[in-house]
Amino acid sequence: FNIPAREILPKPKQDPHPPIWMDCTQPSSYEIAAKHGIGVLSFGSGAPAGMKQHIDKYREDIKSAVPVGGFVNNKWANFTLGHCGDNDQEAKELGSKAIKEFFGPNRPYTADRADVYERLLESWGGVPDHLASNFSRFQGGDQDLGGGGVPRAQLGELPADLLAERGVIVAGNPDSCIEGVKRHQEIGADQSLLIMQCDQIPHTKVKRSIELFGKEVIPAFKD
């Protein structure tokens, strides 16, 4: 094979070793990571505004860490869905559809978890006041869904623009995606972990999204 020189991240060989990270989804795991001087890979889906308190506590707790490795890795990475497209609204709608399907019924992250949609709805920022009266149709009367169906239905009705505005998804055209990443940056996150290859997004659009992130979004954070 004739492979041109390429930069590999993270570096497989580092002194004394590559940074140690921990997959975390809840406050107790953030505390464990801080206690042992481990970086947080936060895979809990949520709006940045709701994550700030956890990042602040992690930063404070890690000051007294007893590191399990050769150094303290005081870093926090937020997971979210990322989709960048040439058409702003189309990309937001597709990103919204993709993350809702990602957490759809009987998916790995939702199967056999009775309260998953109630918790997701809360972590995504809840039902906004201006939509509360419209969403009330899911409770009571002929459309009463009961048994966790209400928060699932409400979650499914949250507008794409709202999810993007809250930073639940980083989606839209390059300018919107830059603003979305900034929402995570502003609460103290060091990195954004963007899942792009969801099954609801066609492969050609995934490739275009990667191209736009590489050419237009990432350079905005070069400094």
Where in the sequence are the language-model features?
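Aromatic- and glycine-enriched pocket-lining scaffold segments that form the walls
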Residues: 2-38
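Conserved, mostly hydrophobic/aromatic
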Residues: 20, 33, 58, 91, ...
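Hydrophobic faces of well-ordered beta-strands that scaffold small-molecule active sites
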Residues: 20-23, 38-43, 74-81, 192-194
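A conserved active-site cap/scaffold subdomain adjacent to cofactor or substrate pockets
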Residues: 25-55, 59
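Short glycine/threonine-rich loop-to-helix capping motif typified by GTGT followed
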Residues: 84-88, 202-212, 222
